[in-house]
Amino acid sequence: MQRSIMSFFHPKKEGKAKKPEKEASNSSRETEPPPKAALKEWNGVVSESDSPVKRPGRKAARVLGSEGEEEDEALSPAKGQKPALDCSQVSPPRPATSPENNASLSDTSPMDSSPSGIPKRRTARKQLPKRTIQEVLEEQSEDEDREAKRKKEEEEEETPKESLTEAEVATEKEGEDGDQPTTPPKPLKTSKAETPTESVSEPEVATKQELQEEEEQTKPPRRAPKTLSSFFTPRKPAVKKEVKEEEPGAPGKEGAAEGPLDPSGYNPAKNNYHPVEDACWKPGQKVPYLAVARTFEKIEEVSARLRMVETLSNLLRSVVALSPPDLLPVLYLSLNHLGPPQQGLELGVGDGVLLKAVAQATGRQLESVRAEAAEKGDVGLVAENSRSTQRLMLPPPPLTASGVFSKFRDIARLTGSASTAKKIDIIKGLFVACRHSEARFIARSLSGRLRLGLAEQSVLAALSQAVSLTPPGQEFPPAMVDAGKGKTAEARKTWLEEQGMILKQTFCEVPDLDRIIPVLLEHGLERLPEHCKLSPGIPLKPMLAHPTRGISEVLKRFEEAAFTCEYKYDGQRAQIHALEGGEVKIFSRNQEDNTGKYPDIISRIPKIKLPSVTSFILDTEAVAWDREKKQIQPFQVLTTRKRKEVDASEIQVQVCLYAFDLIYLNGESLVREPLSRRRQLLRENFVETEGEFVFATSLDTKDIEQIAEFLEQSVKDSCEGLMVKTLDVDATYEIAKRSHNWLKLKKDYLDGVGDTLDLVVIGAYLGRGKRAGRYGGFLLASYDEDSEELQAICKLGTGFSDEELEEHHQSLKALVLPSPRPYVRIDGAVIPDHWLDPSAVWEVKCADLSLSPIYPAARGLVDSDKGISLRFPRFIRVREDKQPEQATTSAQVACLYRKQSQIQNQQGEDSGSDPEDTY
């Protein structure tokens, strides 16, 4: 009958315990293997009888090339394998003394050794758990060590492997000398450590020793003995190897910086900056995003505009010299744009999505991240601080400027119900790869608030300075890295200003970096105007007018110059582009593509122009029109019209185009022609159609009474007032300018401040009395371009009807926030009952402006300690066509304050001293 493993070996335990002294006498016979008969007689069984390990032993014997019961004994405990905990509780085995067995079979003696003299372990194998051949084969199939060690592994896999408990490993270590083979460092799935084979020939042992000595020279230093007993120990060397293999390959990965400096130490603000030697990447490599982040850090630390421009310019010089293809992504990252305005790409990532991505990327709790964001007021700082808590075994490659910009565009293109989850996945991937301050600026860019004070004009100035000092198109190494070297400070400044004007004028006509940058890199700055010219299909920033308080001011401004007065229509600016191939595009004041909003206008273009007209750009105002009454409708009616993908058959609100300027005609730019010439060409090449396309009503006169009557008539005709423009002198079309050569004279201007203001709603106060249960007042703010802040300017509570108050309450309650946005500044203003997400823009009129110690708007621009506030503000309307960044700026508020008659009388200044501003 088949016996268990324990009963198979148990009868011999006493016999072995009584003969320990005869172990030494058998040392003379260690060189010869014992006869098989003696082994069988000692076992008391025949090899073909009831041994429970006979078959596995024979199968292994064919592999090992040895015979007899010796192999059976070596493999027999595999069937009776026990947990390591049980083995650790077994008392040390007694030494065997059987005279029939030689030293190679008696592994329990403290002096036991192999035929070659290698010390043997002293534990009784019959009580040790052993693996089956199947387990060994499975481990062999999972072995993924490098090819250099494969020969050694094949030798080791021929030997049966045994498990050691912690106590046994410690005991074995005490008896081993320095030459004894140690556990190989290859990773295993189990905790079983390999031990020397007990029955091998002397040549085999010698060969094995040579292989082990070879490995000793190549493998890393031996770990502490205590780690050998850990259940997970075999995995640790594998992890270490993976890290070591990753390190040498990491710098070679795409986008990794191998320049003379590590990106973390990059400093574009240093004096005497060298675009090649001080860069942190090599020629042809992608610009590390960390270099961009370090540049933003340096810009954030200073407030002087010239210093900010110089710092950004130094980065751009390195990009031009080393990685020209990355110039466009770096510029867009600096502007926090995703492309030209007409592409309509916006990130649309709210703070909630950002915080969720931060939490998932760093393993933090979402509530903890939200609490920190509320405390710090800056999602960027929260992302940066959270990043330091994350540890990765295999860190992703370093971020590159082009890679980050590409991810931003991917996020902007996502639409649909699952877009939020996809956005979070992309953002999470960016955060995981962030180093140092990268997370701060990625989070800020995604939120749409980079908070650097880098306006568009500053970025253009930095670009012109970069390509002037370090001209593009040079062979590497560039022969000229500082073209201004040798010039005096004054001459250098004048030269850079002249170069900057070239780029500025070109950008006004072609406000599309996608077109400008390739030409700039190929032909240089001085030849840029030759290759980038105004053309249909690329929207322009329109020319705007300055406000004026009365007719007398108009006459004083223009003096002897001829001028014209036109109706100022209350609608939306529409820039009509007709391309050579017949395609028509319509753009808004903000260069947004509104072509899909006005299919009715596009359909009427062929009949409003003469056949000789092949291409043009018209400046017009789209106004709501009542076809039955044949009159202009209020602006609010126009805002009810659908904005996107409008079906012409479903249009409820009809529009009429009022054309007042012609900018481009049949391949020729007209921006440098006087208004009189542009107006003549407009009327000669286009045909009026009532209710569809009409020229702006105008009057050419210098008579004050006629102008006053014309103003009153414009109001009766549902217009806002008049636009007064010079006809011949200084009468060019000034793109992107708020020019003093165009003055707006509204009916409201005759009493009061001279202009309305477009302000952002940042808070709401709960109403009382008849306004109880809804908002009764609102906190408004102007926009500061330099600090990118919204600065509180007044509390508004008048000008609303009951219906309007209810509408505002319903629309604004969805914008309620637990705390103000970090870029909202209120100083001493009364804290509102509800903070609002600053997205709504309202047009407001006031009696005048006054200095205020409470409100921070324009503080420091007129008075060093006081801001400016509105007296008796009154709500006019909602400006749905404006974003918060397009609201009245603090600089404009200061300008309006200075232009008040009583202030001018005190200062003895003329309003003409105000500089014309590019917006």
From Swiss-Prot:
Record's GO cellular component terms: intracellular membrane-bounded organelle; nucleoplasm; nucleus
Modified sites of kind Phosphoserine: 47, 49, 51, 66, 76, 141, 199, 201, 229-230, 801, 819, 911, 913
Ranges of compositional bias, category Low complexity: 249-260
Keywords: Acetylation, ATP-binding, Cell cycle, Cell division, Disease variant, DNA damage, DNA recombination, DNA repair, DNA replication, Ligase, Magnesium, Metal-binding, Nucleotide-binding, Nucleus, Phosphoprotein
Catalytic residues, chain numbering: 568 (n6-amp-lysine intermediate)
Modification type N6-acetyllysine: residues: 226
SUPFAM superfamilies the UniProt entry points to: ATP-dependent DNA ligase DNA-binding domain, DNA ligase/mRNA capping enzyme, catalytic domain, Nucleic acid-binding proteins
Residue numbers binding Mg(2+) 1: 621
Site annotation Interaction with target DNA: residues: 305, 590, 770, 795
Compositionally skewed regions (Polar residues) per UniProt: 98-116
Reaction(s) this enzyme catalyzes, per UniProt: ATP + (deoxyribonucleotide)n-3'-hydroxyl + 5'-phospho-(deoxyribonucleotide)m = (deoxyribonucleotide)n+m + AMP + diphosphate
Any single biological process term in GO: lagging strand elongation
Enzyme Commission number(s): 6.5.1.1
Annotated Basic residues bias: 119-129
Gene Ontology molecular function: any one: ATP binding
Residue positions binding ATP: 566, 573, 621, 725, 744
Residue numbers carrying Phosphothreonine: 195, 207, 233, 798
Result for mutant: residue 641 to L: In IMD96; results in decreased repair response to DNA damage as shown by rescue assays in LIG1-deficient cells; severely reduced DNA ligase activity; 2-fold decrease of affinity for DNA; 5-fold increase of affiniy for Mg2+
Cellular compartments annotated: Nucleus
Region annotation (Disordered) ranges: 1-270
The protein's required cofactors: Mg(2+)
Domain of life: Eukaryota
Subunit note: Interacts with PCNA. Interacts with POLB.
Function: DNA ligase that seals nicks in double-stranded during DNA repair. Also involved in DNA replication and DNA recombination.
Disease listed for this protein: Immunodeficiency 96: An autosomal recessive disorder characterized by onset of recurrent, usually viral, respiratory infections in infancy or early childhood. Other infections, including gastrointestinal and urinary tract infections, may also occur. Laboratory studies show hypogammaglobulinemia, lymphopenia with increased gamma/delta T cells, and erythrocyte macrocytosis.
Name of the protein this chain belongs to: DNA ligase 1
Organism the protein comes from: Homo sapiens (Human)
